[in-house]
Every structure is written in structure tokens, then in C-alpha cells.
């Protein structure tokens, strides 16, 4: 089984690329989905987050209000580190358990582990990855996509972009780079070529 990390900057198109790999036959493990599961009401991480940030981060339905929590942590490096300290170890353990489950049930699979902050936090060695794909896009495209997708103000967009390492730094650490600055078809062609390379290794 091959286990490859997939990452990039916010709004570079990592989710789009992950779906393309899925369409080609990869098994995709999504850190964002696992991150949502580990902070569901009743979990230890949920209790710690509410304890650290207060009831204001709890929505009407009792789940975490991700928008409110995001506004807090994107404005405050100390708060962001506190949140990461609560969640990252839990997320890592769940991802590793899922990889081991897949190794037992799908030994011939190519597994793409979509971890948005892979190169911002732990690094590929924490997940025993055999390589890292970084999805890149121009900063102005990231800004336009964030505006369209999340309806964020210019200040909020800059805060989110500045909270992550620059995409150029991540690109330097990549084993493979997918440039998502062009059309979807251009991106798909790059993914197809890389998929064939992964299958042949």
C-alpha cells in the first residue's frame, strides 16, 4: 500500500485535487472530516475547547461554531497554538488508525491523506508518508476563492492567509507539485500523470 500526503495553502484547491484522485481510484483519508469528528459534543477535545475558549464557541445546536472559533484563532497566535495542542494529537491518532485499518483491508491501495496543515504543523514523518503532494495557486486566486467560497472580508482573508506558511515554502518541501492556477482540465491532466506515476512505483 502506498500512503501519500496531500496538502497546500488555504483555497489552493486541495479538496478538488483530492476528489480527482478519488475519481481515479485512490482511497482518500480527509483530516478535516476526522477533525470534525474528534470535536463532536461529548468528546474530550470538545470539552477542552469549550473550557479553553468559553461558551461563545458553542453554536445553537450544541456543536462547535467553527466560524466563531476560526475568528478567535486566526486573530491570535497563542489561541491558535492552544487549539492545535488540543486537537492535533487526536487527529493524528485517528489518521494513523485509519491508515492501519486500510493496510489490513486494502493492501494494494494508493491512499491519499488530505491534511491541510501537514507542512505547517507535524510534517510527513508523523504519518509515515511515502511522499507529499503540494497543491499551489497564485495568492490572488486564493483571495478570490476565499471571497467567493466563504464570503470573508478582505481583513479576514489576509488573516487566514498569513496564519499559514506561504505556499512557496511548502512547494519547496514537496515531492510533487500540482499547479491549480489554470483550468480544471489542466489540473486534472497533472493529477492523471501523477496517478500513473504512483501506480507504476
Which stretches of residues belong to each language-model region?
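N-terminal polybasic phosphate/anion-binding patch
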Residues: 18, 28-40, 55, 148, ...
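ATP-dependent small-molecule kinase phosphotransfer cores
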Residues: 33-110
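Small-molecule kinase domains that catalyze NTP-dependent phosphoryl transfer to phosphate-bearing small molecules
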Residues: 97, 124-126, 148-197, 201
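ATP-dependent NMP and nucleoside kinases share a basic, alpha-helical "lid"
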Residues: 96-105, 110-148
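Residue-level signal for inorganic ion chemistry
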Residues: 13, 32, 83, 112, ...
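Walker A (P-loop) phosphate-binding motif
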Residues: 1-33
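Well-ordered beta-strand positions
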Residues: 27, 131, 175-176
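An amphipathic alpha-helix signature
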Residues: 46-50, 139-147, 154, 158
